[in-house]
Amino acid sequence: MGSQETTISVGGVAGPVHVKIFPVPDCLFCGIAASEIPATIVSSNPRTIAFRDINPQAPVHILVIPREHHPNLAELAATDDGLLADLVAHAHEVALAEGIADTGYRVVFNTGRHGGQTVDHVHAHVIGGRQMTWPPG
């Protein structure tokens, strides 16, 4: 598929947002979603997939991604808020399945280099299984 273009306004600044639909060449998470790159999948559905983080920061650390390529949280929210809702719902389903929903967990979206985003494909970190501290670091 090609790419779509839409215009959004974030903080009063309008600009084009380019949406590249799955798969994007050289995108690690698109490769995982396409079963081209191995990962420890914990659950999936037609729109999202959840797999264990290769560098866990807690006893439970799972990433939930959309199967479509969206580079970050702001772009996903601006172009497909239904998919964002599905992603968050899947994160909660993962917490339930992993047994951390009752004691508590974090859902974290890192956005941009300074936000700690290392893969330019939006993903939610579901982190739990221990007492979390604040600030997160």
What are these model-predicted stretches?
Residues 2-137:
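HIT superfamily nucleotide-processing domains
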